[in-house]
């Protein structure tokens, strides 16, 4: 590795040395000596009297360089003319003092010591290499036992551990035929004597023969380690140190404090200990002291070196005078305060300031108000330059004086300097890229920065004391970027979902809402006006009110095909306010957009529409006008909240009385024993929840409307002008739920443990709470605050992990020409469309042509509607809607074929700009920010099922909402005695479609449901189409016949029970655990036979109709009774699934991205086949799936399943691979393994979206797909074919793809592999770049691993380039990196031409060649 110091040394011609990769490897003792400028022999630092460094000490000037610039220590040589002279008296070279920051020293250790990282960082590299347990190695290192280093002709094995006694015995027995040592030197000899190549070949041979999975794993780990040593030219013995480098003194300074004391870096203490112990050891060795003393000293030296490298990794940490552990070298680089995160990834910058923000309602969108004082300080260099240029100051010093005195001319120049010079405003926490935007500054008096109200949403800022930072871009390029890319006017759309983020809120919304409302019998109603100007005049003169219904002549403009404005004049029924508002609407929008009551949603839609139709400039000007108008009319409206606005409904008393009497009734039933305690509790809570709903409905109905007599003398209802209602209805502030607490009832509250208290708060805030009610409600309030604090930290950590996993994903090419993609359709759950197809595919690129007639039998001649590779924008989405297309295959990031990066077509639209994404866009970071930014809005809690939530869990029927045709999917069913369908399949679905076969609703139907409609029948809205018993799972007879009981021995395998209430007798099957031992093998079964006693076969199969009954089944038949297909043979009661917690909110998102296996995950079928159950063990059942292949050979898969798992399948049932056998949350790893990449993508996308949708947050699917691509970037090699990979090795998927292409060209055997899903933390640490991984987490482990393997970092990602201080290979830095790569290739190309002429070219491995090729392709 090039020394870090020479890294940025400039050449003689002043150019910075170019480097393309950074390599990390072990340092050999010779290399450490070559870095060093001399040996540190004494532990002294500086002389306490003269304050000069001691010679040969830790701060020695002779080794490290002078303290003052160009001045030796004794003062003989001073000043520049003696540059380079070495003083003969004090031995100091005369040079700059900054060399003390880069010159290193070294310590020659008297005895070798092990490097603690390679010993203790798990898995221990030394242990793995020597194949010895860590305990044994530690005992050797810390002088507790001997290790045999040379066995000779004796019976002792090499690397055998001997205790003191065993060693003495062996000495007596064999004399000096063997050699055993202790301490690091023994380990060093063992490492030195290793023949790596030979060892590797032996292990590979062993790997071929071995069949034990664990041994193979261990051996392949060793092979990887040994190979990495061979490839990287590292010698194993370098893991043991003979020479210790000493850090340059200015990086571990000794600072004099006042009062004669010194503040020092902890490293100096640690070094002192090492030097002291080392010198003592040298002396003891010279004196040939007794072995036991020397040993003790060697052990202490080993401990001192351990503490210096990584304090606290082994044993207790060494503490300083103040009892806190000393900060070692390892602590310097890891953690939030370490080198990586504190100094390399986040630096403080010059030319910045911060201040409180206030509102600037008169600013334009691209402006911000900057206090004069601040501007003067920030723009100083520019002002100095201008003062000199204009000849007002002769020198910079004079200019500085003028500015300090704040002369009047300075202010004029400041105005000049600031003109068109953007500044950047940033509000912490910067959760997404809109947290920093550029504005043009306007100088203002005062000391607070003024911010435009419309950008508050992007910054998440409010004016309750928030502070913001200002940064000044200095260079011309920086100013250009700030203006072109970061100006607030260029960031109208949110990168997360493509909707406008410059949206009015609060006052502005209220103003516009008030302005566009209509009121019956307003002054001036029924007037006819010639134009909007007249409307404004009448309003100003007080002739007409704002809400008066009038007729106005409106002129609308539309662009024709030649780009000319065409006007269209209409008479429209409207109001005065809307006519006035029309005056600010830009040309090209229709009056329909304005001619309605404008709430927050409709204003947002209007701006979005304006952006798509008229472009950026009009939208920005319109947004500003909307804001000014909104503020004006909000002030005019005089809307404010008074206590009389909270109107309590009169029905409230009755509703609460009714609820109380219902509760009393349930209480009585409980006391007579009719209901259990749990049922009583649930019912009480349900009663109160519905009472609360009724009260709030009564309250809202009361608030929302009022009835008035109109001009015709008739009653008419209109929306009320109640202030609180207007604020909620417009979306300005507040919501129905909050109004309910003000004027309805507060409702049910939770206890600290999350359970719901069954007595609700019946009062509201207007009536006031009594003491008990207040006490109950304090808990919730407190929990809310605690939650918020937790949430912020957790959300921040999630964002950090997401950014880290996705940071190197950049758009690198235009089109990868893949035909792959994912199939998208609308998401329908139950009766409502959660997300329409239009919303999902907008801004995506088609992967396949869309044909006009999708249901036409002859596809070949049907016309192409939209070609593949077309970006679906609003226009094409309208076509999709028009032709009723409901399934579209679109390109996706997950299926993109680009090797390192993604192509623009697979990504689709850049949401923040509204057109196809550009090359160099850092889509990974944008995706991470889009998912992480709303993280703070998610909840932290896990939901306990119980009370109100339990009603949802026990639905028992399907009631449809829209009229339509019933379609049944995946249905196996039998027809019962009443002619109804009884479902006997597991994954049945019921859809309601319209006459064009578009799905409107979709429901899952459980096994045993009775369906009232047949496929293709019409159902009307509100009709119940299917029902089932929610509390039991039935066993359904698939044929008619007579029941025959098998193995049902009373008292052994079954018992009879009689119900007290009904007097009916039923048979209950005993669980195997409850049976006597003799009955364990009985398998209670119901068989269906015909009149003659023969088996009946299930139609269409050769399986006889017999049903094995699981434990706890209840049978209400008698042996031999007649049954009809579709009858219920037995019922299995659902165990009341206690309170299973549903993880929701932020923890759920984190679990999904970390790909955690859920507790009690669903069990899926590993292969397709027929289910059977084998012999049971104590706590488990043996599930067998038997499949037949084409040749008729049987293939059996076995799995042991815990008994308490509730199985969804019966014996003899056929399952498909990936089908659910036992319910539970599905594990994404299983989905990937059994159903493939598309299924796991769909699963994660839908589950994550589910959480965000609950909070009303919109995020585009493609962001989640970007993260999933990164989670899937590794694959596991199964068979290595003709490649260099090892079986079981985890390799980048892109690497395998490249190697396979090469192998295919050469006609060799390809690598077979499976995709591997890694959680985001694992995936970040498994990245190819060690710099990126080390700066993320587990720094020690990453660096240890990389240095042993001699890893190279190609600086491909963003993070690595930030750390080495370069432009990032994304955005405007993308071109710079492309140039560098091309230059590098042209240079290496010309070099290789030279070499070709001289000698045959060096053979390149297929890997390297293909990697270079793809890199070149990506680059060009």
UniProtKB/Swiss-Prot annotation:
Pfam hit, one = RNA_pol_Rpb1_4
Cofactor(s) recorded for this entry are:
Mg(2+); Zn(2+)
Q: Which reaction does it catalyse?
A: RNA(n) + a ribonucleoside 5'-triphosphate = RNA(n+1) + diphosphate
Asked if RNA-binding is a keyword of the record, the answer is: no
Hey, what's the signal peptide range on this chain?
Answer: none
The residue ranges crossing the membrane are: none
**Gene3D superfamilies linked to this entry:** 1.10.132.30, 1.10.150.390, 1.10.1790.20, 1.10.40.90, 2.40.40.20, 2.40.50.100, RNA polymerase II, clamp domain, RNA polymerase Rpb1, domain 3
Question: Which residues are recorded as binding Zn(2+) 2?
Answer: 816, 896, 903, 906
Which is one Gene Ontology cellular component term of this protein?
Answer: DNA-directed RNA polymerase complex
Official protein name in the record:
DNA-directed RNA polymerase subunit beta'
What organism is recorded for this protein? Blochmanniella floridana
Origin organism lineage: Bacteria, Pseudomonadati, Pseudomonadota, Gammaproteobacteria, Enterobacterales
**Gene that specifies this protein:** rpoC
């Amino acid at each position: 590795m090039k020394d870090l110091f020479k890294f940025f040394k400039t050449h003689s011609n002043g150019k910075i040395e170019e480097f393309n990769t950074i390599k990390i490897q072990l340092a050999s003792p010779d290399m450490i000596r070559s870095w060093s400028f001399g040996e540190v022999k004494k532990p002294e630092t500086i002389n306490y009297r003269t304050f000069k460094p001691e010679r040969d000490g830790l701060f020695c000037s002779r080794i490290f360089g002078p303290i003052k610039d160009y001045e030796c220590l004794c003062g003989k040589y001073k000043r520049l003319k003696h540059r380079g002279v070495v003083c003969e008296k004090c031995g100091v070279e005369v040079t700059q003092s900054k060399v003390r920051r880069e010159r290193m020293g070294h310590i020659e250790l008297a005895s070798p010591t092990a490097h603690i990282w390679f010993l203790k960082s798990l898995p221990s590299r030394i242990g793995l290499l020597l194949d010895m347990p860590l305990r044994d190695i530690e005992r050797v290192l810390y002088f507790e036992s001997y290790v045999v280093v040379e066995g000779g002709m004796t019976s002792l094995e090499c690397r055998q551990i001997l205790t003191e006694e065993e060693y003495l015995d062996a000495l007596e027995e064999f004399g000096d035929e063997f050699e055993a040592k202790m301490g690091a030197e023994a380990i060093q000899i063992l490492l030195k004597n290793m023949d790596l190549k030979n060892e590797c070949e032996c292990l590979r041979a062993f790997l071929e023969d071995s069949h034990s999975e664990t041994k193979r794993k261990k051996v392949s780990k060793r092979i990887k380690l040994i190979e990495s040593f061979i490839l990287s030219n590292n010698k194993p013995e370098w893991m043991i140190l003979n020479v210790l480098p000493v850090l340059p003194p200015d990086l571990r300074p000794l600072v004099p404090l006042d009062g004669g004391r010194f503040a020092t870096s902890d490293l100096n203490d640690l070094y002192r200990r090492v030097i002291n112990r080392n010198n003592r050891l040298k002396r003891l060795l010279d004196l040939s002291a007794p072995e036991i003393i020397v040993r003790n000293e060697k052990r202490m030296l080993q401990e001192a070196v351990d503490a210096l490298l990584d304090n606290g990794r082994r044993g207790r940490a060494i503490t300083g005078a103040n009892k806190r552990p000393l900060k070692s070298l390892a602590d310097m680089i890891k953690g939030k305060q370490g080198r990586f995160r504190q100094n390399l990834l986040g630096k403080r910058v010059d030319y910045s300031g911060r201040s409180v923000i206030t509102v600037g309602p008169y600013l334009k969108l691209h402006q911000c108000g900057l206090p004069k004082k601040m501007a003067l300080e920030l723009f100083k260099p520019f002002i100095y330059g201008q003062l000199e240029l204009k000849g007002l100051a002769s020198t910079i010093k004079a200019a500085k004086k003028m500015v300090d005195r704040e002369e009047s001319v300075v202010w004029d120049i400041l105005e000049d300097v600031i003109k068109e010079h953007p500044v950047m405003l940033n509000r912490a926490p910067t959760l997404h890229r809109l947290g920093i935007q550029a504005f043009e500054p306007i100088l203002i008096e005062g000391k607070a920065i003024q911010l435009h109200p419309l950008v508050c949403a992007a910054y998440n800022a409010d004016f309750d004391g928030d502070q913001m930072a200002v940064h000044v871009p200095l260079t011309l390029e920086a100013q250009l970027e700030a203006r072109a890319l970061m100006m607030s006017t260029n960031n109208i759309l949110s990168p997360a979902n493509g909707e406008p983020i410059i949206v009015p809120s609060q006052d502005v919304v209220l103003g516009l809402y008030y302005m566009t409302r209509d009121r019956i019998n307003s002054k001036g109603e029924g007037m006819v006006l010639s134009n909007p100007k007249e409307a404004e005049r009448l309003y100003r003169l007080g002739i007409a009110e704002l809400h008066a219904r009038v007729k106005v002549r409106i002129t609308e403009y539309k662009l024709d095909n030649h780009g000319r404005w065409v006007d269209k004049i209409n008479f429209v029924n409207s109001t005065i306010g809307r006519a006035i508002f029309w005056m600010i609407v830009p040309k090209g929008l229709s009056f329909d957009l304005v001619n309605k009551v404008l709430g927050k949603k409709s204003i947002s839609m209007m701006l979005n529409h304006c952006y798509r139709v008229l472009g950026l400039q009009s939208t920005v000007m319109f947004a500003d006008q909307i804001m000014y108008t909104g503020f004006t009319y909000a002030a005019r409206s005089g809307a404010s909240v008074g206590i009389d606005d909270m109107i309590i409904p009169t029905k409230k008393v009755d509703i609460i009385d009714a609820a109380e009497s219902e509760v009393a009734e349930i209480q009585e039933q409980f006391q007579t024993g009719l209901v259990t305690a749990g049922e009583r509790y649930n019912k009480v809570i349900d009663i109160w929840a519905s009472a609360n709903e009724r009260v709030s409905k009564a309250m809202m109905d009361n608030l929302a409307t009022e009835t008035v007599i109109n001009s015709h003398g008739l009653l008419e209802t209109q929306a009320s002008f109640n202030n609180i209602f207007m604020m909620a209805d417009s979306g300005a502030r507040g919501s129905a739920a909050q109004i309910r607490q003000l004027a309805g009832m507060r409702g049910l509250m939770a206890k600290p443990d999350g359970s719901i208290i069954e007595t609700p708060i019946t009062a509201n805030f207007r009536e006031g709470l009594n003491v008990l009610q207040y006490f109950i409600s304090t808990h919730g309030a407190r929990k809310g605050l605690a939650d918020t604090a937790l949430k912020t930290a957790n959300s921040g950590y999630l964002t950090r992990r997401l950014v880290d996993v996705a940071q190197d994903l950049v758009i690198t090419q235009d089109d990868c020409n893949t035909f792959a993609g994912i199939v998208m359709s609308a998401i329908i759950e139950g009766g409502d469309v959660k997300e329409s197809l239009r919303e999902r595919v907008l801004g995506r690129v088609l992967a396949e042509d869309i044909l006009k007639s999708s249901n036409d039998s002859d596809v070949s001649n049907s016309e192409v509607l939209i070609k593949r590779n077309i970006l679906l924008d609003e226009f094409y989405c309208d076509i999709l809607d028009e032709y009723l297309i409901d399934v579209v295959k679109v390109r996706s990031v997950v299926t993109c074929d680009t090797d390192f990066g993604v192509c623009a077509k697979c990504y689709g639209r850049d949401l923040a700009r509204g057109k196809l994404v550009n090359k160099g866009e850092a889509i990974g970071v944008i995706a991470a920010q889009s998912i992480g930014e709303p993280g703070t809005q998610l909840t932290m809690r896990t939901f306990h099922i119980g009370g109100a939530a339990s009603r949802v869990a026990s639905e028992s029927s399907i009631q449809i909402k829209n009229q339509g045709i019933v379609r049944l999917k995946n249905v196996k069913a039998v027809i019962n005695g009443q002619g109804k369908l009884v479902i006997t399949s597991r994954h049945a679905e019921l859809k309601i479609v319209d006459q064009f076969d578009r799905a409107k609703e979709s429901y899952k139907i459980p096994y045993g449901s009775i369906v009232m409609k047949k496929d293709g029948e019409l159902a009307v809205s509100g009709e119940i189409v299917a029902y089932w018993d929610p509390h039991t799972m039935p066993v359904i007879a698939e044929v008619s016949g007579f029941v025959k009981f098998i193995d049902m021995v009373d008292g052994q395998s079954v018992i009879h029970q009689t119900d007290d209430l009904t007097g009916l007798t039923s048979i209950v099957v005993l669980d195997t655990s409850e049976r006597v031992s003799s009955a364990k093998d009985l398998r209670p079964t119901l068989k269906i036979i015909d009149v003659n006693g023969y088996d009946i076969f299930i139609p269409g199969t050769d399986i006889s109709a017999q049903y094995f009954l699981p434990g706890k089944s209840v049978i209400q038949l008698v042996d031999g009774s007649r049954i009809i297909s579709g009858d219920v043979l037995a019922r299995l009661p659902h165990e009341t699934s206690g309170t299973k917690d549903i993880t929701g909110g932020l923890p759920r998102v984190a679990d999904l991205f970390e790909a955690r296996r859920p507790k009690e995950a669903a069990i899926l079928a590993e292969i397709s086949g027929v289910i059977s159950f084998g012999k049971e063990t104590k706590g488990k059942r043996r599930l067998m799936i038997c499949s037949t292949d084409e040749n008729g050979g049987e293939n059996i898969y076995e799995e042991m399943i815990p008994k308490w798992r509730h199985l969804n399948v019966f014996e003899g049932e056929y399952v498909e691979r990936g089908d659910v056998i036992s319910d539970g949350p599905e594990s994404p790893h299983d989905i990937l393994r059994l159903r493939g990449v598309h299924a796991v993508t769909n699963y994660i996308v839908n589950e994550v979206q589910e959480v965000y949708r609950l909070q009303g947050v919109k995020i585009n699917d493609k962001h989640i797909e970007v993260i999933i691509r990164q989670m899937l970037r590794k694959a596991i090699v199964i068979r290595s074919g003709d490649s260099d990979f090892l079986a079981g090795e985890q390799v980048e998927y892109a690497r395998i793809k490249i190697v396979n292409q090469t192998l295919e060209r050469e006609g060799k055997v390809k690598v077979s592999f499976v995709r591997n899903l890694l959680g985001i933390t694992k995936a970040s640490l498994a990245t190819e770049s060690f710099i990126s991984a080390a700066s993320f987490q587990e720094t020690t482990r990453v660096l240890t691993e990389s240095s042993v393997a001699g890893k190279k970092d190609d600086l491909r990602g963003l993070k690595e380039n930030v750390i080495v201080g370069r432009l990032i290979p994304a955005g405007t830095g993308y071109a710079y990196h492309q140039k560098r790569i091309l230059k590098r290739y042209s240079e290496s190309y010309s070099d290789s031409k030279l070499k070709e002429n001289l000698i045959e070219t060096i053979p390149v491995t297929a890997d390297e060649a293909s990697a270079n090729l793809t890199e070149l392709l990506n680059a060009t």
